[in-house]
Amino acid sequence: VTVVSVMTPEVIALFYAADMVGATLNLVDPRYSVEGIHEYIEEVDSHLLVCLNVVYERCRQAAKRTNVEKVIVLSPADSLPPVMAVGYKLTTPDKNKYASNVIRWKQFIKGGEGQSTAAEPYDPDHACIVVHTGGTTGSPKGVMLTDNCFNALAQQFRAYDKLFHRGQKLMNIMPPFIAYGYACGVHLPLVLGFTVIIIPNLDPAKLGSLVLKHKPEHMFGVPTHYQQLAADPKLRDKDLSFIINYAAGGDSLSRGAEQTVNDFLAAH
């Protein structure tokens, strides 16, 4: 199942539902071109495509000359409270002309009412997702990650119970189409009983304000996120003692930058 989307509650539900029936999610960056999306659909021979409505036209073009049979379309409004959903639809009207093979998300969910929820037996070697490398050593490559990969990560963190407790919060600012975003930002916190705060499309300039608003004990990001926090004037003289574990990955962090961030955290 190829998924072209940012992180939304629907994409998280889809991850677990697909895994339970033995399917694999092929996660694709929604910023990719028609050609790029087409290549990744072909790579795994997807028969089902799931995409955001804002990238539907690109996905429709990309699905031509592939084995895609059905397209499930998500809207950012699907998870919003009614008043906010109406506001979103008024300010961002959906002008797509959908083909006959399209199923809207809510229609898809309604169609499953009363159906069997029997799951496949657990298979630790089942590939739950396919993500793609950055292409730094050539063309991007698909990487299959198993259920065991995801569960091993969660169990490693669970073993350190001095830091991680049920009921804490993790702010997920990472996209779903990188392994880091899904494994550390979704599966890990849910296994540990955390509340996950989803930021689907992060504006880096607002990161400090989001941290102050939600006060998450945990966050996973890249080094530049923490350098930005350390330099954010909105955080000056603020109490950030709620922070327990803010981790960086995905890129290198110079010794000087690491010291700057650590000094900032120690001072707050």
Range-by-range predicted roles:
Residues 34, 42, 54, 60-100, ...:
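Conserved adenylate-forming
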Residues 151-169, 177-218, 232:
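Conserved AMP-binding/adenylation subdomain of ANL enzymes
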Residues 95-132, 139, 162-169:
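Conserved pre-ATP/AMP-binding loop-to-beta segment of ANL
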Residues 128-152:
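Conserved AMP-binding A3 loop
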